[in-house]
């Protein structure tokens, strides 16, 4: 029996074959990994036209209705994580394409969030670059997190865990989202900001933890950044 053809897109880090176990489907599925991003739609369609299954890395390549209509062989579209706003699920379903996701954990994004915050506060990148280029040694002074205000846009599973770490550092943590209530904020032990603008104006650090969608797209732009202190 001819094998089904599966393509993995935008695997910049080469993790799909290194961290995932494909052994259970190796006899039925032939896997091709594309590590480089296809920025041109014509090139993308040409590359994917012969594949039955696609695996996408988050929102790196959107799949709107127009693109799905140009992939007649496609039967299954898998995204890392359970939600991907860049896939037109309704259009895929109408064409008989099954869309599904993989299980995800909250710990990795929380850890990455704090790695980025700490690197920024302590100027880790600048100091490392200076060290590697021959100096100057210790040319900047870091910023303490204790006593600073952390503003969270979004207080779901990830945001609430980020909040707990912030509290452990002795930070004043506030949160805001379109649907956040005082009761939900109190459950996590913090205060709900009166508005997005109020949060931005009073926070030393801001971290966004909202699902990408029409309501959250462009949430922070030039005018919002100008409000930050």
Residue ranges and their predicted role:
Residues 43, 86-90, 109-112, 185-187, ...:
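Short, charged, surface-exposed secondary-structure boundary motifs
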Residues 24, 139-229:
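Rossmann-like dinucleotide/phosphate-binding beta-alpha-beta segment
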Residues 83-86, 104, 108, 157:
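Residue-level detector of alpha-helix initiation sites
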Residues 95, 101-149, 153, 164, ...:
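Phosphate-binding beta-alpha-beta segment of Rossmann-like dinucleotide-binding domains, i.e.
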Residues 1-100, 201, 221:
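An N-terminal-biased, well-structured beta-alpha scaffold segment characteristic
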Residues 37, 61, 105, 130, ...:
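Residue-level "edge-of-site" marker
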Residues 12, 34, 58, 103, ...:
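Tryptophan-centric aromatic hotspots in well-structured domains and transmembrane helices
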């Amino acid at each position: 029996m001819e094998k089904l053809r599966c393509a993995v897109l935008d695997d910049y880090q080469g993790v799909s074959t290194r961290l995932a176990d494909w052994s259970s489907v190796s006899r039925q599925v032939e896997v091709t990994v594309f590590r480089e991003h296809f920025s041109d739609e014509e090139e993308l369609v040409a590359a994917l036209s012969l594949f039955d299954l696609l695996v996408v890395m988050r929102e790196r390549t959107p799949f709107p209705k127009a693109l799905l209509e140009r992939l007649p062989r496609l039967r299954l579209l898998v995204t890392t994580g359970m939600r991907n706003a860049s896939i037109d699920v309704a259009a895929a379903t109408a064409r008989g394409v099954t869309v599904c996701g993989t299980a995800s954990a909250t710990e990795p994004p929380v850890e990455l969030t704090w790695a980025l915050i700490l690197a920024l506060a302590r100027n880790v990148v600048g100091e490392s670059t200076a060290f590697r280029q021959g100096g100057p040694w210790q040319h900047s002074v870091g910023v303490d997190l204790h006593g600073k205000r952390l503003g969270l846009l979004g207080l779901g599973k990830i945001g609430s865990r980020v909040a707990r770490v912030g509290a452990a550092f002795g930070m004043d943590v506030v949160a805001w989202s379109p649907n956040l209530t005082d009761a939900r904020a109190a459950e996590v032990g913090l205060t709900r900001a009166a508005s997005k603008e109020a949060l931005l104006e009073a926070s030393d650090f801001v971290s966004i933890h909202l699902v990408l969608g029409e309501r959250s797209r462009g949430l922070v732009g030039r005018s919002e950044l100008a409000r930050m202190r």
